[in-house]
């Protein structure tokens, strides 16, 4: 945990109270070993970040006073993932890890070859998924949560996002092992926004491939090795962000002109 995050409603008049049952209390007291008067990195989810000072600390609770707070000076990367709904243990890892990478959104879709019971699992509820997204932010030291949606099928997802996916300035790629013309690392990336679709354990069916193709998705691969969904998701994000030189520059906050998430041609 590299930043302690709070929901906006937890902060009243610049102060927040944590009880001994709260994992954040345990981290501050037992891991950081801080006491009254000490400061720690803190932030408000989807809001400001900076530091907080412990004004009072007992064995039962502590009071933190926020100070030196400012808005993050960069936005999330304009990268969006569409993922075939994976097993719960995989989903936890994906939500945590891609959230820490700073992507804009995660869209979970039921697939024809996927296990339908995954969609009915407790982890499919937004509150549960929210928890793992926050863990990724705590690791990365950020405050901005990616958007997350759940769709029953690829067809449903496409119909719900036609107005977005139909935008010609959005580049769309689907990771696949069939009908690919190039690999992800060699794909010429262009445009301000990039979508990447990644299948669940058993991949995509032909009808799902046709749906994505109709929405303008191009098939690419990541070599001959068969990867787990969580591995493919993190690797794909890393390849795209590295090729876009995303880690060498700041993404402007909303309202400012954004640079394309594209690879610079020699």
From Swiss-Prot:
It is an enzyme of class 2 (transferase). GO terms for biological process: rRNA base methylation. Signal peptide: none annotated. It catalyses: uridine(1498) in 16S rRNA + S-adenosyl-L-methionine = N(3)-methyluridine(1498) in 16S rRNA + S-adenosyl-L-homocysteine + H(+). It comes from the Bacteria. Pfam families: Methyltrans_RNA (PF04452), PUA_4 (PF20260). The gene is rsmE. This is Ribosomal RNA small subunit methyltransferase E. Specifically methylates the N3 position of the uracil ring of uridine 1498 (m3U1498) in 16S rRNA. Acts on the fully assembled 30S ribosomal subunit. Keywords: Cytoplasm, Methyltransferase, rRNA processing, S-adenosyl-L-methionine, Transferase. GO terms for cellular component: cytoplasm. It is found in: Cytoplasm. Its EC number is 2.1.1.193. InterPro entries: Alpha/beta_knot_MTases, RsmE, RsmE_MTase_dom, RsmE_PUA-like, tRNA_m1G_MTases_N. Its main location: cytoplasm. Belongs to the RNA methyltransferase RsmE family. GO terms for molecular function: rRNA (uridine-N3-)-methyltransferase activity.
């Amino acid at each position: 945990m590299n930043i302690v995050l709070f929901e906006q409603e937890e902060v009243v008049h610049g102060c927040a109270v944590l009880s001994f049952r709260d994992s954040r209390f345990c981290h501050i007291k037992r891991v950081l070993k801080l006491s009254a008067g000490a400061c720690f990195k803190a932030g408000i989810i989807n809001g400001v970040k900076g530091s907080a000072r412990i004004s009072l600390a007992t064995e039962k609770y502590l009071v933190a006073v926020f100070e030196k707070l400012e808005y993050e000076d960069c936005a999330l990367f304009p990268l969006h993932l569409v993922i075939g709904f994976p097993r719960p243990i995989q989903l936890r890892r994906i939500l945590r890890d891609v959230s820490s990478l700073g992507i804009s959104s995660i869209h979970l879709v039921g697939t024809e070859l996927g296990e339908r019971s995954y969609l009915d699992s407790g982890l499919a509820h937004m509150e549960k998924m929210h928890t793992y997204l926050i863990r990724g932010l705590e690791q990365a030291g950020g405050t901005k949560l990616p958007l997350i949606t759940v769709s029953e099928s690829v067809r449903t997802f496409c119909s719900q996002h036609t107005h977005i996916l139909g935008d010609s300035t959005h580049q769309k790629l689907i990771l696949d092992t069939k009908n690919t013309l190039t690999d992800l690392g060699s794909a010429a990336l262009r445009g301000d926004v990039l979508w990447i679709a990644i299948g669940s354990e058993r991949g995509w069916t032909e009808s799902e491939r046709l749906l994505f193709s109709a929405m303008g998705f191009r098939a690419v691969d990541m070599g001959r090795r068969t990867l787990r969904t969580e591995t493919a998701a993190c690797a794909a994000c890393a390849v795209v962000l590295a090729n876009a030189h995303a880690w060498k520059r700041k993404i402007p906050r909303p309202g400012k002109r954004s640079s394309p998430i594209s690879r610079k041609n020699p």
